[in-house]
Amino acid sequence: MTQNTSLSYRDAGVDIDAGDALVERIKPLAKKTLREGVLGGIGGFGALFEVPKRYKEPVLVSGTDGVGTKLRLAFDLNRHDTVGQDLVAMSVNDILVLGAESLFFLDYFACGKLDVDTAAAVVGGIAKGCELAGCALIGGETAEMPGMYPAGEYDLAGFAVGVVEKSKAIDGKASITPGDVVLGLASSGAHSNGYSLVRKIIERSKPDMNAKFDGERTLADVVMAPTRIYVKQVLATMQKVTIKGMAHITGGGLLENVPRVLPENTVAELEKAAWPRPKLFDWMQAEGNVAENEMHRVFNCGIGLVIVVAAADADAAMAELKAQGEAVYRIGKIRARSGDEAQTLVV
């Protein structure tokens, strides 16, 4: 090729036509997520959203996260339809902990070469997650960056904004007291955390990922199960019961996430026999010879969201959560802390 040859963006590795085709695939997916407050459609330089008028003193709550190395399994297994829901769940469940209703979500998809079908599958999962959370997929960015990512790989980031009435924002550190009850909502699996260890165990064990593992589900099905989104169910419960604190059980497991919402003078004492541990965690512990404490410091071990309520409200909270379709367990209690003991114990 001589210096006089005309170059195009496509010659440099960026396919504008593919990007345009993806936008057309995305538009109907995003449209399904529209809700009250969205002003305008996809394609503008920015997105407008009007805070619902029912809020007297609205406080905006924001969250951002990725999917971590679960993406590597998505590449290896060629399964791209669930990681989008994972992406949404990571942020909307985080802001839910503060009592926030999710309003809108934006995503960032980066790759070396854009594969429209793969990207559309990912965004389809994002749209499904937004529908489950009741928030609008209001915009996003698709970045095709030649030379930055290996062929067939991509990275994801997501951003959620929600709102809570100022007087109803949940602050566990200010309201949780000894005697309160700890409830646990079931997870759908490992969610989106601990996947570097998941992958290491798979690398060591070399299982048949397509063999039946849990009932009719294969191991691939189980490890790629999308993160459960708790938003609508918990918001409905908050209308009937006072929730004193919540913890989204992500990286760090129960042992490192529950203390984030506890007053310094309290301990959450959890009973591991109080909830059923999904087969995946027992398999990983056995195949990886993982210590029990490490399991609870890395994985959710079957509990995706922890809710703390007053003892007098525990039965009502459990009944309402069950009515909303959640599997909920009474997994422990809050007690006074002795000295500098750990703030969360799994016994």
Curated annotation (Swiss-Prot):
Pathway: Purine metabolism; IMP biosynthesis via de novo pathway; 5-amino-1-(5-phospho-D-ribosyl)imidazole from N(2)-formyl-N(1)-(5-phospho-D-ribosyl)glycinamide: step 2/2. Keywords: ATP-binding, Cytoplasm, Ligase, Nucleotide-binding, Purine biosynthesis. Its main location: cytoplasm. The keyword ATP-binding applies. HAMAP family: AIRS. Its EC number is 6.3.3.1. It is found in: Cytoplasm. Belongs to the AIR synthase family. InterPro entries: PurM-like_C_dom, PurM-like_C_sf, PurM-like_N, PurM-like_N_sf, PurM_cligase. The lineage of its organism: Bacteria, Pseudomonadati, Pseudomonadota, Betaproteobacteria, Rhodocyclales. GO terms for molecular function: ATP binding; phosphoribosylamine-glycine ligase activity; phosphoribosylformylglycinamidine cyclo-ligase activity. One of its GO terms (cellular component) is cytosol. GO terms for biological process: 'de novo' IMP biosynthetic process; adenine biosynthetic process. The gene is purM. It catalyses: 2-formamido-N(1)-(5-O-phospho-beta-D-ribosyl)acetamidine + ATP = 5-amino-1-(5-phospho-beta-D-ribosyl)imidazole + ADP + phosphate + H(+). This is Phosphoribosylformylglycinamidine cyclo-ligase.
